[in-house]
Design a protein with these regions (language model features):
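Active-site acidic carboxylates
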Residues: 1-135
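Internal catalytic-core helix/loop-beta-alpha segment
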Residues: 117-167
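Short Gly/Thr/Asp-enriched flexible loops that form oxyanion-binding sites at enzyme active sites
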Residues: 175-185
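Short, well-ordered beta-to-alpha junction loops that form the rim of enzyme active sites
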Residues: 84-86, 140, 169
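Glycine-centered short loops/turns at secondary-structure junctions
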Residues: 76-78, 160, 186
Length: 186
């Protein structure tokens, strides 16, 4: 059964150019499973529940695939980390440019109410198979490696993780902000 996970595609000309630059399409031909983490970004009630303030209905479709990836990573000895979008006093104070200029006052208030720690919107989506050994890390900006959050980089380094599989609610927002930062941090 084929499942359409998202509507993104890469033009064949871009794939060819990248392949020529790298000497092949794949960045890694093999993964060391014990040094690999599955980073699950923003699969939370505030993004996924029907009628939620920041609902992205399409994200519900990827849950079975995310669960399969998480289980495969665990079975191979890797780590699963759930990243939670967090709006709290620190986020509002340290990312005022976003909250004051990119959000209307009404939208800002909705986000403040939807994503504080412990709120319904902050909770991991119940369809995800979260195990006690999995980690949960809060983020206060689009990227999981951005400032003013627990240092995901240090958490991963302490566990000798150097390879990430990133899945999440919005490929073109928080996943895309997380991936290049991870690469830049090696």
């Amino acid at each position: 059964m084929e499942i359409e996970l998202h509507r993104n595609s890469i033009l064949p000309a871009v794939m060819e150019r990248v392949g020529q630059r790298r000497g092949g399409i794949l960045v890694f031909s093999r993964l060391d499973s014990k040094r690999t983490a599955h980073i699950v970004v923003d699969l939370q009630d505030g993004f996924m529940a029907p009628g939620a303030v920041a609902e992205i209905a399409e994200a519900r479709v990827i849950v079975p695939t995310v669960n399969r990836i998480s289980q495969a990573v665990r079975d191979a000895g890797g780590l699963v980390v759930y990243i939670q979008n967090t709006v709290d006093d620190v986020a509002i104070r340290t990312w005022s440019t976003f909250f004051d200029h990119f959000c209307s006052p009404a939208r800002r208030q909705m986000m403040i109410e939807a994503f504080p720690p412990g709120s319904e919107g902050h909770a991991i989506w119940p369809g995800l198979e979260v195990l006690p050994r999995d980690l949960k890390v809060q983020k206060r900006r689009f990227g999981a490696f951005a400032p003013d959050a627990p240092d995901l980089h240090d958490i991963l380094r302490a566990r000798d993780i150097d390879t990430l599989i990133i899945t999440g609610t919005a490929s073109r927002v928080c996943c895309e902000f997380t991936a290049p930062d991870a690469m830049m941090l090696n």
